[in-house]
A protein has these predicted regions:
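Alpha-helical recognition/docking segments in bacterial nutrient-uptake
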Residues: 1-3, 7, 61-179, 183
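N-terminal helix-turn-helix DNA-binding module of bacterial transcription factors
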Residues: 1-63, 339
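Conserved hydrophobic residues forming the short capping helix/wall of the S-adenosyl-L-methionine
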Residues: 44, 89, 211-212, 242, ...
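Short acidic/polar active-site loop segments enriched in Thr and Asp
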Residues: 18, 64, 121, 186-188, ...
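Helix C-cap/helix->beta junction micro-motif
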Residues: 47, 92, 146-150, 215, ...
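Flexible loop/turn connectors
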Residues: 239-341
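Hinge/beta->alpha junction and helix N-cap segments in small-molecule ligand-binding domains
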Residues: 71-80, 99-107, 129-133, 165-176, ...
């Protein structure tokens, strides 16, 4: 135990008490038996333990609420994550507070401060600044300050953030996708959607290039088209692509929403999917199933992702050991939007 930073949870485990009991001793709360107090103080002295804000705050009464920040709940990716998290939270007697930031930094800062003022027991963030390659410095500082007072879990890599992280591993799902496309006879791939300052998008592009390289194939820069992560973005990008009179063989959409925009543009231009162009996507949300044709899509395993984030929070609050960084694998769901050539 001496090889790592000692936490209030380590003290609680060794003393055989709850983290809240340790916090009461640290704050000189009278509601602790003398026998427990002496035992805890001896362990604190043994490790020369210096409590931080999180250790002290555990002695306060729980609000049984968890705040969750997402960019836009209208995106089925984020709504699915929220619903799955809420289902787990309810099993442990917690309520969820949903905050939509609309991908706006000032809104993220405001929501984060408001959640702290409401004394929520933990905070989850998915998307937004947590996905940026260069997140806002002020926001990172605020996240780190918050993480010293309460459990903070982000559903991504979030550079610079000193909190718990659960991110999606892109390589496995992309490998399945490329193997499938190659088996269908496709070799020239276009990637549509996103921007190169967003970590999940960068990881997808890296994974795609790596997987193609294994088959001695390349992804030329002109085959990567940036656009917004929504239906309008996919529609505009596909219009641009079709107007270039260079009909693609297969398109990988960065998410299902972009794929829906691509479908809309193709329908207007009398381009048939998959007869003329194969189309595959990422996320495997309800959009994949209601699309015509139904979309082959890489599943982000959102249920597992959500459960890991919630279990991390419950473990921290309960004083159980948990990994600082966890990952979730992706897998391919094959439907009707890809043809054999």
């Amino acid at each position: 135990m001496s090889e790592k930073a000692i936490t209030v949870y380590d003290i609680a485990r060794e003393a055989g008490v709850s983290p809240a009991t340790v916090s009461r001793v640290l704050t000189n709360n009278a509601r602790v038996s003398e026998e427990k107090r002496v035992r805890i103080e001896e362990i604190i002295k043994k490790y020369d333990f210096e409590p931080n804000g999180l250790a002290r705050s555990l002695s306060k009464q729980e609000t049984k609420t968890i705040g969750m920040m997402v960019p836009d709940i209208r995106n089925p990716y984020f709504s699915n994550i929220f619903i799955e998290c809420e289902m787990v939270a309810s099993q442990y007697g917690y309520n969820m507070i949903l905050c939509n930031t609309m991908n706006d930094l000032s809104s993220e800062l405001s929501h984060l401060k408001n959640l702290c003022e409401k004394h929520v027991d933990a905070i989850i963030q998915v998307g937004g600044n947590a996905d940026e390659i260069r997140p806002d410095e002020e926001y990172v500082k605020l996240i780190n300050k918050t993480a010293k007072k309460m459990p903070v879990v982000v559903g991504g890599e979030f550079p610079g953030a000193e909190c718990y992280k659960v991110y999606t591993e892109k390589e496995h799902g992309m490998k399945e996708l490329i193997d499938y496309l190659l088996n269908c006879g496709h070799k020239k791939v276009n990637l549509v959607g996103g921007r190169n300052t967003v970590i999940p998008t960068v990881r997808k592009r890296e994974s795609l290039k790596n997987c193609l390289k294994l088959h001695n194939l390349e992804l030329a820069d002109e085959l990567i088209i940036d656009c917004k992560y929504d239906i309008d973005g996919g529609y505009a990008a596909m219009k641009q692509l079709l107007n270039s009179h260079n009909l693609p063989e297969v398109i990988i959409a960065v998410n299902d929403q972009v794929a829906m925009g691509i479908l809309k543009a193709c329908q207007e231009m009398k381009i048939k999917i998959p007869a003329d162009i194969s189309l595959v996507a990422y996320d495997d949300t309800s959009f994949s199933e209601i699309a015509t044709p139904q979309l082959t899509s890489v599943n982000y395993n959102l249920k597992m992702h959500s459960e890991k984030m919630m279990k991390t929070i419950i473990d921290i609050i309960s004083g159980n050991e948990t990994e600082k960084v966890k990952s979730v694998d992706t897998y391919l769901t094959i439907r009707d939007s890809c043809r054999n050539v």
